[in-house]
Amino acid sequence: MYYLFKDLFFPPVSEADEEGVLAIGGDLDPERLKLAYKSGIFPWFNEGEPILWWAPDPRMVLFFDELVISKSMRKILNKKIFKVTYNKNFKEVISNCQQIKREGQNGTWISNEMIEAYCELHKQGIAKSVEVWQDEVLVGGLYGIDLGHVFCGESMFSKVSNASKTAFIALALYLKKENYKLLDCQVYNSHLESLGCREIDREEFMSILKSK
């Protein structure tokens, strides 16, 4: 386990432990966050606890040709129940991701400090959001880090059925059109698996991340 201080430094991802934890400490300075994502590392920790930096093996990703859109979801998309926008209200999206209640979780890992840091990355054009609207009301969305050829998804929320799925599918289709290589989903999630995401070796993920 590496301990981070003020220096902008991360150890090789191969040094992560079996759970995927690579380092502890440091801060959420935008420059550190940018270095982290470019290095295949992301922060994930509970509010009030030290910052943990992760580089899990395997890594959950979506290759766009493997995106699964069910028949029922296609009907919803075709009915145009929702309106999808990009980067129209980043702060409201990340705030909703913080506040939404999730099954099996007592609290949130998205602290106010994280919101401030990612909003700064949004101002720099690096953190981006997808918004899903119904009758002019924000009902779903997601946010993440855009590396230009890989998009690192961070969190999503849904206030009505299928809103977060709509955000995810819309983003995947957009990234495919723009010739991105993959959508990074970080760790296994059965919901994401149903949409076509799968786990790959960290070595393969890093190879794709470092190629442009």
Swiss-Prot record:
One of its GO terms (cellular component) is cytoplasm. Coiled coil: none annotated. One of its GO terms (molecular function) is leucyl-tRNA--protein transferase activity. One of its GO terms (biological process) is protein catabolic process. SUPFAM superfamilies: Acyl-CoA N-acyltransferases (Nat). Keywords: Acyltransferase, Cytoplasm, Transferase. The keyword Protein biosynthesis does not apply. It holds the Pfam family Leu_Phe_trans. The keyword Magnesium does not apply. Its EC number is 2.3.2.6. It catalyses: N-terminal L-lysyl-[protein] + L-leucyl-tRNA(Leu) = N-terminal L-leucyl-L-lysyl-[protein] + tRNA(Leu) + H(+); N-terminal L-arginyl-[protein] + L-leucyl-tRNA(Leu) = N-terminal L-leucyl-L-arginyl-[protein] + tRNA(Leu) + H(+); L-phenylalanyl-tRNA(Phe) + an N-terminal L-alpha-aminoacyl-[protein] = an N-terminal L-phenylalanyl-L-alpha-aminoacyl-[protein] + tRNA(Phe). It is found in: Cytoplasm. PANTHER family: LEUCYL/PHENYLALANYL-TRNA--PROTEIN TRANSFERASE, LEUCYL_PHENYLALANYL-TRNA--PROTEIN TRANSFERASE. Functions in the N-end rule pathway of protein degradation where it conjugates Leu, Phe and, less efficiently, Met from aminoacyl-tRNAs to the N-termini of proteins containing an N-terminal arginine or lysine. Belongs to the L/F-transferase family. This is Leucyl/phenylalanyl-tRNA--protein transferase. It comes from Flavobacterium johnsoniae (strain ATCC 17061 / DSM 2064 / JCM 8514 / BCRC 14874 / CCUG 350202 / NBRC 14942 / NCIMB 11054 / UW101) (Cytophaga johnsonae). The gene is aat.
